[in-house]
């Protein structure tokens, strides 16, 4: 079996976790108490969904997941929510005081008190797996727990499970709106610390998702539940090939192989289509060509940046539902003839396709329409460097005045860590720039670094 363990860290991670597991349960017909009427085999069968759920002798399906937060309120909602019987109480881990939006508290002071307990619980889950494939880690960049504790946990996971893949789903701070003033600090510190421990990181920015909810779903004031359900659909599309049998299945490690040309350049851009409300879907049936085209519209991306300014290095199209390879090939051929989509000259073919016959499921009473087919595109493009540049600029503005730095130093960090992290990200921006150059331009100067 190729099991995956999901780790949800901090408020953002836990709330996205709720949305994801709610959706997985609906997709597999698992009830909130963990029973699955359609599953006739008792105990751990060899069904595809066993990658994400373990089965008890009593026929209960338990998610292979851990929820961690340094303060209890958010996880308490899981403990009392609809799906409270789904999880083993030991899978929900909380501390007493939160990280107060402070990376240093999440990584050093408060985080280190709880990290051994968390690793212990993860070890228990890992021991139930016959062939653990890797970890999916959900967190935000901006919060103290999401940034600090995640980076601590990733370092420890690398020690304990060296070669296992670690994929991140990270909530990147939105360009305009912000939930904390110190987001740029936390983001840059966590990116620097986890850069060498993460194999692939899918970034999602709240503002981009707000805009999609407003524009495509006509939700005037999107709530976090609206956002998370949309993120849940995306995560579900990415993991569908692990949980269902399909025509072209894609493995966790396969994502990395096809999307990550150099170890540091592992931040694919995620685009999902169609995001459409029930009223609209009633009147239009979207063809494979239409949803494929929609993926190349910057408006449907999960991070605000413009791929038309960058170059694509690799592209992975994950279709689900009523899709046949013939239509996909035609749609991709059309895309390739359009000159707006530029690939780097050292990666000529760049499209990987996965097809899964399980149509997208939607949460009843949710905002998304039930559609026959959907596609999730993961693309590694140099345009995502815009997102880093934006963040680095905000960091510089604050750091030039050493604003808020004393909160971090007071928790045992050194100022040197800030400049070290900032230099690392400057190098990352440079890496992206070099990758986007034509092979003729920079004659092998970058070659020594890798």
UniProtKB/Swiss-Prot annotation:
Site (Involved in polymerization): residue numbering on this chain: 450
Post-translational modification: Undergoes a tyrosination/detyrosination cycle, the cyclic removal and re-addition of a C-terminal tyrosine residue by the enzymes tubulin tyrosine carboxypeptidase (TTCP) and tubulin tyrosine ligase (TTL), respectively.
Any one GO CC term of the record: microtubule
Cofactor: Mg(2+)
GO molecular function list: GTP binding; hydrolase activity; metal ion binding; structural constituent of cytoskeleton
Disruption outcome: RNAi-mediated knockdown eliminates microtubules in fat body cells, resulting in defective nuclear positioning.
Keyword Protein biosynthesis set for record: no
A Pfam family of this chain: Tubulin
Active site (record annotation): 254
Biological process, per Gene Ontology: lysosome localization; microtubule cytoskeleton organization; mitotic cell cycle
Residues noted as binding Mg(2+) in the record, renumbered to the chain: 71
Compartments, record wording: Cytoplasm, Cytoskeleton
InterPro entries per the UniProt record, alphabetical: Alpha_tubulin (IPR002452), Tub_FtsZ_C (IPR008280), Tubulin (IPR000217), Tubulin/FtsZ-like_C (IPR037103), Tubulin/FtsZ_2-layer-sand-dom (IPR018316), Tubulin/FtsZ_GTPase_sf (IPR036525), Tubulin_C (IPR023123), Tubulin_CS (IPR017975)
Self-association and partners: Dimer of alpha and beta chains. A typical microtubule is a hollow water-filled tube with an outer diameter of 25 nm and an inner diameter of 15 nM. Alpha-beta heterodimers associate head-to-tail to form protofilaments running lengthwise along the microtubule wall with the beta-tubulin subunit facing the microtubule plus end conferring a structural polarity. Microtubules usually have 13 protofilaments but different protofilament numbers can be found in some organisms and specialized cells. Interacts with Ote.
Role: Tubulin is the major constituent of microtubules, a cylinder consisting of laterally associated linear protofilaments composed of alpha- and beta-tubulin heterodimers. Microtubules grow by the addition of GTP-tubulin dimers to the microtubule end, where a stabilizing cap forms. Below the cap, tubulin dimers are in GDP-bound state, owing to GTPase activity of alpha-tubulin.
Protein name as annotated: Tubulin alpha-1 chain
Gene: alphaTub84B
């Amino acid at each position: 079996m190729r099991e995956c363990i999901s780790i949800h860290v901090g408020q953002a991670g836990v709330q996205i976790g709720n949305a994801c597991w709610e959706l997985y349960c609906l997709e597999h017909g698992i009830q909130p108490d963990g029973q699955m009427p359609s599953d006739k085999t008792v105990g751990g069968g060899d069904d595809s969904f066993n990658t994400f759920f373990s089965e008890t002798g009593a026929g209960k399906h338990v998610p292979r997941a851990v929820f961690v937060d340094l303060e209890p309120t958010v996880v308490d909602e899981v403990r009392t929510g609809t799906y409270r019987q789904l999880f083993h109480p030991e899978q929900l881990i909380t501390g007493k005081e939160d990280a107060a939006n402070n990376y240093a508290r999440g990584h050093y002071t408060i985080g280190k008190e709880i990290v051994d307990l968390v690793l212990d619980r993860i070890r228990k889950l890992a021991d139930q797996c016959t062939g653990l494939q890797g970890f999916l880690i959900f967190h935000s960049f901006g919060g103290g727990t999401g940034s600090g504790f995640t980076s601590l946990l990733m370092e420890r996971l690398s020690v304990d499970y060296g070669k296992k893949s670690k994929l991140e789903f990270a909530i990147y701070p939105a360009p305009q709106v912000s939930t904390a003033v110190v987001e740029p600090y936390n983001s840059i510190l966590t990116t620097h610390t986890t850069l060498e421990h993460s194999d692939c990181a899918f970034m999602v920015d709240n503002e981009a998702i707000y805009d999609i909810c407003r524009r495509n779903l006509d939700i005037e004031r999107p709530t976090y539940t609206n956002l998370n359900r949309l993120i849940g659909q995306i995560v579900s599309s990415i993991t569908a090939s692990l949980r269902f049998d399909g025509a072209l299945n894609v493995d966790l490690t396969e994502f990395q192989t096809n999307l990550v040309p150099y170890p540091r350049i592992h931040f694919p851009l995620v685009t999902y289509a169609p995001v459409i409300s029930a009223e609209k879907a009633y009147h239009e049936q979207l063809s494979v060509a239409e949803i494929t085209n929609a993926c190349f519209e910057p408006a449907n991306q999960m991070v605000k940046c413009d791929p038309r300014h960058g170059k694509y290095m690799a592209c992975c199209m994950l279709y689900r539902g009523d899709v046949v390879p013939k239509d996909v090939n035609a749609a991709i051929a059309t895309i390739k003839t359009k000159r707006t989509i530029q690939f780097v000259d050292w990666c000529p073919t760049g499209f990987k396709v996965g097809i899964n016959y399980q149509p997208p499921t939607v949460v009843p009473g949710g905002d998304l329409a039930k559609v026959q087919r959907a596609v999730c595109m993961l693309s590694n493009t140099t345009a995502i460097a815009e997102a880093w540049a934006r963040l680095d600029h905000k960091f510089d503005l604050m750091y030039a005045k050493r604003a808020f730095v004393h909160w971090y130093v007071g928790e045992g960090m050194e100022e040197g860590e800030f400049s070290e992290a900032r230099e690392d990200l400057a190098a990352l921006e440079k890496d992206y720039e070099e990758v986007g150059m034509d092979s003729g331009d920079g004659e092998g100067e970058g070659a020594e670094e890798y």
